[in-house]
Amino acid sequence: IRQEICRGASQDPGISDMLCLQRDFEIPTALLLDFVDTLIQDQYPRALANVDELVQFAYGVASTVGLMMCHVFGVRDAKALPFAVDLGVAMQMSNIARDILEDAERHRIYVPASLLPTPVDCDGLVQGDKVQRASAYQGALRLLAIADEYYASAALGYGYLPRTVRQAIKVAARLYQAIGEKVARSEKSYWQQRTVVSAERKCLLITEL
């Protein structure tokens, strides 16, 4: 896939469509490569040491998508781009805080070790080690506090978006942030079920925007 992106041509229908989209909206090849390279690195078990490593990962899997969307939306002001990066980081942090157990089952720990009160490992989390799970949950709360800072920064850039898409992006961001808020209120049930924001809560949040 990487070679085909660099060539700008592919026999695969999906990749070919993506390359057409890239040409139509003048999406930089570097963004596609950053995205693909991060997915390649993520094929293998991993654990992140610190927040900087997490931000780099989040950039690769999420911020790159936001930057590509800027091109699709016709956002040309370079001042908007850092806000798109921040929103991608924030949303990925929300995902990570929600999916610790699911990720551990896939031999991945994305909550940085620097945010964990005590060390954790995938086996301990999956097997229900109480000390490790308590540590991971506290790490998730610390991560969500950082995510909120990124959401706040991203919100400063909504004005760069065309009116036709601005509200949709604001809704998506708010609903993702609400995942973290639900995680923070779900200590007793966090490990029993995946955190989900109810339809009623989503509707309320949307009406508040």
Name each model-derived stretch.
Residues 1-91, 97, 101-209:
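Catalytic cores of Mg2+-dependent Asp-rich isoprenoid enzymes
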